[in-house]
Structures are given as structure tokens and as C-alpha cells.
Amino acid sequence: MLMAQNQHTGLSEQLASTGNDLWALLPEITIVGTLILLILFDLIFKKNKSIGLSVIAFVGLAYAFVLLIQQWYTFPNSAALMGGLLDINRLSILLKGGFVIGMSVALISALRSGPKQNDFFESSEVLVMLFGLLLGASFMTMSSNLLIIYISIEVVSICSYVLTGITKGKKKAEAGLKYLIFGAVASAIMLYGMSWLYGFTGSLDLTDAGFSAAISEIPRLPLFISCVLVMGGFIFKLGAFPLHIWSPDVYEAAPTPVVAVFSVIPKLAALSIIFKFVNIVSSPMIDWQVWIGVLAIASMTVGNFSALWQKDVKRMLAYSSIAHAGFLLVGILAFTSGGNQAMLFYASIYLLMNFAAFFLIQVFEKHTGTTSIDDMKGLGQKLPYLSVLILIVMIALTGLPPTAGFNAKLYIFSALWDSYQTGEKTILLWILVFGLLNTVVSLFYYLKIPYFLFFKTLSNEIQIKTTRTIDWLWGTLLVLPLLLLFFRSDWFVGLVNSINFELWIPK
């Protein structure tokens, strides 16, 4: 009788635990359900599918966002899921909320503007891949197990490969193949490094106390090799130096709304994994501040100087994203709560800036038929309001007032300076110097677009189409937060400061 009662109690506890896990994973379950509905709708209905597919997609995203708002108040602290394979907390919830908002912006942009962008909603393939990417990125932010991290990254990667080459064209197919080859190599390297860590620690679970204890016992060279191999895969998804070569071709070839997604969601998901990995796999034998500092300096410098010579705006923003990856890494190496909060604030503003930039580029692409900077000559005379909007976005990407881009870089540099004063490590001072110099360099290529818009002569060959009011309104809605958060960023800073980053690092 006693044994039966114990079994009944154990079963009840397991069911309760499973119920809690399913509640915590409801946003991801919603994404999966939306994905399945998109496929079924596409199979059942053969004509005029765009309205139905768009309704399913936006309702799914809206419901997932509502669930995330509820979870923000339900999970103020960190909670383990699925036996410790996943970890939910306010930081992962905030990141997932940003991903959902970003995906919604990309889909609205695809629906409202640009050449042949409504093809997104004529069949489910692109939408299914985008929702698959969103699902993988969501699990990346919650993963506490090396195997789950690998699977999540692969889901994001496979969807990205398909999205790059899904449209017709030799250039697009070439970019997709190049992305696939580089991604396969990076995944293999990362998996090999994970196998080393598993061999040394006997565990794949980052939350396992034995994992952290075993890390400190690994000799310097094997530990260094393991970490370099694993970080290689993470850096590839972040798009930082030296695994950034795929970015320009992919950005140029993929549809503009898809590029907007590529430029933000996989990067921020990878950043969350790097943050967790660096804080857990800590050892006196690995000076993360030096290694990540070198990567940050190289990413900022290579990205900015390469962008100077670009004639295509999407390739220019690809190199710009490499430079921004360097700035995102700076927040990690500060190793302070202020640095972590600055990193998250910068990441949030980066999301807003990039989606605004790519939407406006998409509008100009509709008028010129290309994304060449030369073809933007004089368009400021015909499209003055949209040109002013893109000027504001370029100022924000540079990191100048009166935009939130200035606040973001100010917080990053302030956190870096505080960390330098605390530890007096020379590498931190060098990063600060290079960061300031690279900000000056970025000014030259970011303002090249407004220069061509306002100070160059309009080509007679370009026929300007009537700009729809919805383009003006949507562009304004995307740019306005960049101005408002410059003057009133305190509420968002308070939101970021409410996150306990120590709870997010599994112990």
C-alpha cells in the first residue's frame, strides 16, 4: 500500500512538473502550431492564399507575444525546464519578445512594400522557414545543454540556408550554397569541440555542478582547443570576425525582409549563448576578456573598413552588422552587471535600427529596382520624407545624437570604462579606443547614403512611383522609437535593470 502511495505521489509530481514545463513552453508551442496551420492551409487552398496565410502568421505571432508578456510576470526568477535541458527567465523572455516583434515587422514590411514581396504570402514555404528560424532562436535563448544548443543552432541554420536560396537566380543560389558550406563546416567544428568538453566533463548539461568542477581540472591546451572549437560555431551565427565571410553575399542575395531577420534574430540568439557559455566555462587558464576583446576589435575594424568601399547598400549593412557584432561582444567582456545591461540595451536598439533600415531600403528598392547606392542619387528631391527617415536611421546606426543609437554606445563605453577602472586591464582600454575610432570611421559610410540622396543629381532613367501613405506611416512608426528612446530611455533602462543576470547563468 505504501509503495502504491509513493508511486502515485511520484506520478502526480511528474504530471505537475510536465504541466509547468508545457506552460513555460506555450510560446514555442504556439509557433509550432502556427507553422503546422500554415502548411495545412497551403495544402488545402490552392488559390488566393495570401490573406489566409498572413492572418494565420500574424495571429500566431500576436498570441505568442501575449503569452510572453504573461510569462514576464510569472517567471521573475530563473526556472529549469525539461529536467534542466532548458532554462526560462526574464532575459530569455525579453529576447524572445524582441524576436517576435522583429518577425512581425519583417512580415509587415514584406506585405506592404517592395518588388514581388507579396510572394511571401502566396505559398507557405517562406513563412514556414521564418517560423522555424524563430522557433530555433527561441530555444537557443533557453538552452542549458550542449546538445540542445547544437540542435537549436542547426534549426536556425537550416532555415537560413533555405531562405537564402529560395528565390530564383544564379547569384542567390550561389550565396545559398556558400552559406550552406560555411555553415556545415562551422557546425562540424562546434560539434567536435562539444565532444571534447563532454569527454573531459562527462556531462552535456551546463547546469550540472560536476560540469563546472570538471572544467577547472582540464589542462590548459585541451581546454583552450575545446573552447575555440565551440566558440567557432557561436561566432559564425553571430557573424563576427573571422567567421563573417558569408554575410555580404547572403545579405545581397536574400530578399530584403529576410535579410532584416538574418541581421538580428540569429545574432542575438547566438549572443545569448556566448554570454552563458563564457560565464559558465570560466577558468583561470582562459582569459575570456583578452580573447573576446581581440575578436571585438577585429570585428569592429574589419567590418567598418570593409563597409567603406561597398556600392550596394545591403552589402554595406552586412559589413556594418559585423562591426556591430564587435560592439555586442564588448558588453559580455565587461563582466559586470552594468556591462550585461548595456549589452542588452544595445542589442534592443540594434534590433530597432536594423528593421527600420531594411524597411526603408526596401521602399527605395521598389522605386529603383536595385539596392545600389549609385541609384539613390537625388531621390531625396522626390522622396524627401522617406529620405529624412533614412537619414535618422543612419545617424542612429553611427551612434550619434539625437537618436537612441547614441545612448546604446554611451552605455557600452561607460560599462567598458567602469570595468577598466575596476580591473585596470590594458585590453579593455584598447577596446575603448578602437571602439571610439571605429565609430568615427562608420560615420563616413553611413552618411554616404544621405549624401547621395540629397546632394547628388537625380538620374533621368529612374521613374519614381507614387509613394503609398502606408509606407510613410510604417516608416515613421519604425523610426520614432529611435528618437523617443534618446530623450526618454529611462523606462526601458529600468526594464533591462529589472533582469538579474546572475540568475540567468545556471549554477
Question: Which residues make up each language-model segment?
Answer:
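Alpha-helical transmembrane segments of multi-pass membrane proteins predominantly involved
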Residues: L2-K507
